[in-house]
Amino acid sequence: MNSTGHLQDAPNATSLHVPHSQEGNSTSLQEGLQDLIHTATLVTCTFLLAVIFCLGSYGNFIVFLSFFDPAFRKFRTNFDFMILNLSFCDLFICGVTAPMFTFVLFFSSASSIPDAFCFTFHLTSSGFIIMSLKTVAVIALHRLRMVLGKQPNRTASFPCTVLLTLLLWATSFTLATLATLKTSKSHLCLPMSSLIAGKGKAILSLYVVDFTFCVAVVSVSYIMIAQTLRKNAQVRKCPPVITVDASRPQPFMGVPVQGGGDPIQCAMPALYRNQNYNKLQHVQTRGYTKSPNQLVTPAASRLQLVSAINLSTAKDSKAVVTCVIIVLSVLVCCLPLGISLVQVVLSSNGSFILYQFELFGFTLIFFKSGLNPFIYSRNSAGLRRKVLWCLQYIGLGFFCCKQKTRLRAMGKGNLEVNRNKSSHHETNSAYMLSPKPQKKFVDQACGPSHSKESMVSPKISAGHQHCGQSSSTPINTRIEPYYSIYNSSPSQEESSPCNLQPVNSFGFANSYIAMHYHTTNDLVQEYDSTSAKQIPVPSV
């Protein structure tokens, strides 16, 4: 297609006319360059629109359905209704408006497109774009309010949230309808470029003001959230101030110690001002108490408090990274269209470059709608993992690689050599393969085993696990480090040790390290016999 034909039909966008004194070969060269640039723009926009249609439709569809499927999640707060509204707007943009825009790209003017199609595209694109952006701005203001602690105990009621959503829909589509009615039928089927002069300019100016205000609100809000979280993370990195005072209750007080212990508190601010460390300390205490009557030492509570502080610091750091990603995505995806719209409002004559800029700006706005479910939803990490898994699976299919297993031998030699070794030889591998029953072995560093053959009853493991040095197997094959305090096994009773207590030292954070020892049925049989010998377990 000829790009000059686009510009002749588009208002405020005139082709680059060549003076009559120049030769015809320079004119043809310039037209050829314009055709090349326009073709590159079409190819780039088409590729991005294909990605938007696939990933954006998938992500928004999953997020939208999760609010109606009881097997997924439900509203944690009433304001989660805004996430539902955002997913619906973005789903319509990615699944309907983006394919319509792809159809518009490959036609020179609106004269070759049906009027009903062009009217529908005008209304849906301009309406859903500003509606999605307003919803993102409202979510940003709500999160900023929660982080700054403005009335943290008072959440928005469900009727108020619904009324706010209806107000956003009314304002957005009123402006979109006015802009659609003021379009010219003889120009390009683009929402903003086809506005006629006069009242069309006034509506376009109002649309630009609304668009710019929403972008500014989102950017400033998440910048303030990132600064607040960064300050909280810096404060938590300082050594905690431990004070003991049993006479009066203090904020951020720890779990009271039974049997004469003193409550422990820390002068550390929480992420939200209505949040303290009681819940975190409760999570930490559950992993190390065998019974409710067991005493908790002050050193153990102190270690739990330090672990809670480290967890909050890590969460603040991840939240800061998320805020930076949100700000960059908003600026990169919204600024090109905003600049082109401002240029259309301020100048009566456009240019070929401005027209290409506007096409690319609309594509980036649609691309932002495809990114929203991977950023704003509570299951965004799961969606990203699924997409990465699909990409890896496709890559393996292209390269025809065999799927690798998670267990790999770490010792010298191949598996056949290790399999043929006798039981008294030391292989120093991550796992041992032998047809003969082994009497001296433990689970490996690649993860705890939850199979039926490797499980021991809780009574046996509780009464006959000893801590001592082993002379046959290196200690590095017996320890499994975990770098998260969350339980990574299906059942806490089977995975957490029952005889290990936190050490009175700050050198090791025991909430981040778990020791898993499992034996096989051979150990169960040895326990039943009178001549059984217990396997010594190394101490930390």
Swiss-Prot record:
It comes from Homo sapiens (Human). G protein-coupled receptor that is activated by the chemokine CCL5/RANTES. Probably coupled to heterotrimeric Gq proteins, it stimulates inositol trisphosphate production and calcium mobilization upon activation. Together with CCL5/RANTES, may play a role in neuron survival through activation of a downstream signaling pathway involving the PI3, Akt and MAP kinases. CCL5/RANTES may also regulate insulin secretion by pancreatic islet cells through activation of this receptor. PANTHER family: B2 BRADYKININ RECEPTOR/ANGIOTENSIN II RECEPTOR, G-PROTEIN COUPLED RECEPTOR 75-RELATED. Keywords: Cell membrane, G-protein coupled receptor, Glycoprotein, Membrane, Receptor, Transducer, Transmembrane, Transmembrane helix. The gene is GPR75. GO terms for molecular function: C-C chemokine receptor activity; G protein-coupled receptor activity. GO terms for cellular component: plasma membrane. The lineage of its organism: Eukaryota, Metazoa, Chordata, Craniata, Vertebrata. SUPFAM superfamilies: Family A G protein-coupled receptor-like. This is Probable G-protein coupled receptor 75.
